[in-house]
């Protein structure tokens, strides 16, 4: 029987909720593009519950223990004396989330002699050193598309919040003020602005579709160009490189994976290409941006605003400059972990575990690494010959021999 080590974020400070704001969730049959939702044989939770925190356990305990497996759940993931470090030694399966990542570095993977599956409850497995997973024949899987729309909605919200100067205006109201001039002296209409996305995959394309009704000019850059029919439908302008797109955009949203080509792609030099007073929204990965360069750009006025929910490391230290830099709209990493999204990624996690334990194939779209090589979504997402090296440096990918 297997030991499953699950790393989840802490419960609410007031305790695990007994009631919720809504009684149910809207139902959808499939994702845009036709991919079906997760199809586990059963679930042991009510959709709409808090599943991503420690007490929620992704709704997995009953299923795992009834089949003879052991489940260890913790939020204590960092440092040599953490629960995660201690329990990893004999774990067969590690489950983590992008929002509260348990970094599977080469050293940790080498230490985990029994590890067979690294499962991301969500999208994005850059917290796993994929080369080490390849070398050790560890399967890496994630619940593709489970929260893509959740993130896309968050991006649109953040764009509007920055451009309309919503957060400082709300703060005036909260503090009892009525300082209209202070609110509107940094506020603009989104209409007719040029908005571009770096990457137009599931999330990037969903962002473009949601922005189209705002009568903006839409731009994108991506290795994989969208079909001509989609470009015409949304009146998209494609740019061969990021550097070509930056100068024409008032707003740039980052929706690409983290790998060697994209790490710190927003830096002092590339920020010089942006329009003065541009906005950046980053819900992809914190290391896409040079931390201090972003803060300097806001302080100098090069950028009019920066918003996102991704940091490095996560959780961010209390003195991280993105917490206090001017005109920021930062939140903890929450865009993809709404209660709606949790129901989907918990069900997808259950589906992957069922397939893994029963010896059935895991969906190709869920796979990142399998059989000592990049597989499925992983083979498509990462540049040929390269991928991310867990939480730190990237390594050249080579197939295990």
UniProtKB/Swiss-Prot annotation:
Alphabetical UniProt keywords: Cytoplasm, NAD, Oxidoreductase
Catalytically driven reaction(s): formate + NAD(+) = CO2 + NADH
Sample GO molecular function, one term: oxidoreductase activity, acting on the CH-OH group of donors, NAD or NADP as acceptor
Residue numbers binding substrate: 123, 147
Result after altering residue 256 to S/M: High resistance to inactivation by Hg(2+), Increased stability at 25 degrees Celsius and decreased thermostability at 45 degrees Celsius
Keyword Oxidoreductase carried by entry: yes
Purpose of the protein: Catalyzes the NAD(+)-dependent oxidation of formate to carbon dioxide. Formate oxidation is the final step in the methanol oxidation pathway in methylotrophic microorganisms. Has a role in the detoxification of exogenous formate in non-methylotrophic organisms.
Similarity remark: Belongs to the D-isomer specific 2-hydroxyacid dehydrogenase family. FDH subfamily.
Subunit structure: Homodimer.
Protein name: Formate dehydrogenase
Source organism of the structure: Pseudomonas sp. (strain 101)
